[in-house]
């Protein structure tokens, strides 16, 4: 009996210690969506910088909804790929225990994208070319904000098209194959993304503005992050990529077999920029 009481006491002490010490401030959990080029690139760069400062960084791969929910619960510290006001606006509104740290990119855009040889310029013209496009819009993951927006485009423009959802990688592969065959194709696309540097593409005009205007990419954190990690919060408030630096980063990352090493090289190449973020 005394042995059992002793074991129970030890367990209570351990539980109390865990409650009082809280989370390890040197371990940072950052959410990331695999296949989303800009998010992967920014996350890998941030990971390199934080690790050089002595932090241990754990990347948690999940969907945007799961990452935001995990941040709201305090299990994930950061997410660098929140698109506002349209793409993730309704998602962010569901979670009261997260906070914005800063804007990392100002010129983001969502839309329906076609190869430049396709001879239409606006979404409303899709109606007249159902045969050429096989009545399909090639989309990405079902949980993505752009997926919901494309569904609304089909309704607003009264298109008789099927929205095909699979993955970002599958969408890009189908786009590449169509371009090789000079076949007409329309996909859910966005900038920044390396595909605009590697392929000749154009956005279709969206006169109804269903897909919105320019978006900003925001960095969000769990609600108490700024209080617990003021130095890191200050750093993330300064992280910013202009169009040139983002294009360079995405170009370097695309096709890289070791994104961590590529991120290290990019950080070294842009040392002055990174120093400014850390001041």
Tell where the protein language model's regions lie, with residue ranges.
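An extracytoplasmic/periplasmic, membrane-proximal ligand-sensing/linker region
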Residues: 28, 38-41, 149-161, 165-182, ...
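Short helix-initiation/N-cap motifs at beta->coil->alpha
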Residues: 34-37, 58-72, 163-174
């Amino acid at each position: 009996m005394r042995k059992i009481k002793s074991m129970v006491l030890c367990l209570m002490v351990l539980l109390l210690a865990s409650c009082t010490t809280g989370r390890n401030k040197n371990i940072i959990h950052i959410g990331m969506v695999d296949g989303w080029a800009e998010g992967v690139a920014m996350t890998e760069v941030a990971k390199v910088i934080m690790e050089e400062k002595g932090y241990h960084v754990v990347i948690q791969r999940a969907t945007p909804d799961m990452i935001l929910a995990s941040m709201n619960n305090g299990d994930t510290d950061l997410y660098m790929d929140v698109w506002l006001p349209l793409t993730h606006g309704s998602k962010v509104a569901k979670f009261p225990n997260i906070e914005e740290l800063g804007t990392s990119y100002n010129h983001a855009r969502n839309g329906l994208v076609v190869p430049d040889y396709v001879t239409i310029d606006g979404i409303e013209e899709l109606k007249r070319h159902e045969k050429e496009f096989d009545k399909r819009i090639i989309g990405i993951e079902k949980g993505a904000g752009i997926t919901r927006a494309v569904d609304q485009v089909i309704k607003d423009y009264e298109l008789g098209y099927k929205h095909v959802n699979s993955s970002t990688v599958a969408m890009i592969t189908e786009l590449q194959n169509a371009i090789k065959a000079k076949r007409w194709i329309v996909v859910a696309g966005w900038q920044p993304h390396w595909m605009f540097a590697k392929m000749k593409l154009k956005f279709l005009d969206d006169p109804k503005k269903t897909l919105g205007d320019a978006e900003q990419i925001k960095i969000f954190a769990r609600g108490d992050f700024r209080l617990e990690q003021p130095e890191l919060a200050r750093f993330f408030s300064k992280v910013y990529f202009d169009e040139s630096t983002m294009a360079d980063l995405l170009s370097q990352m695309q096709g890289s077999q070791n994104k961590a090493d590529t991120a290290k090289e990019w950080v070294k190449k842009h040392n002055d920029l990174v120093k400014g973020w850390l001041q």
